[in-house]
Amino acid sequence: MVRVSTFAAILAMALSVTANVTPNDAGAKNVGTGNGQQFITGGCVNGTDCQSRCCAGNGENKGVCSNEVAANQNGKTGCGFEDPNKAQTVKEAKEQVKKQGF
């Protein structure tokens, strides 16, 4: 019984460490605007999109607004992310806004 519990705990920890943060699509209208209106967990192309001024890479070449304290958690690469595919990211965000209707 103890072995099963230990294995389950280690497995859960391993899965949580490797899980990457996905930008929240609800903030698609704020991606690439550079006006500092994006909320924490919303997508970003750089720090000027974020209220916190911290755009962290999510380890999959996507930006997510983060608090500086949490910028290196859950696979994030820290503040200072600059999206190398900015034009494509902004295009996808605009498509998401049309799809959502807001």
UniProtKB/Swiss-Prot annotation:
Record has Secreted as a keyword: yes
Stated role: Secreted effector involved in biotrophic colonization of plant cells.
Any Gene Ontology CC annotation: extracellular region
Glycosylated position list: 46
Organism encoding this protein: Pyricularia oryzae (strain 70-15 / ATCC MYA-4617 / FGSC 8958) (Rice blast fungus)
First-listed, main subcellular location of the protein, grouped into a coarse class: secreted
Gene: BAS2
Protein's cellular compartments: Secreted
Signal sequence, start to end: 1-19
Protein name: Biotrophy-associated secreted protein 2
Domain of life: Eukaryota
Induction: Expression is highly up-regulated in invasive hyphae.
Annotated keywords: Glycoprotein, Secreted, Signal
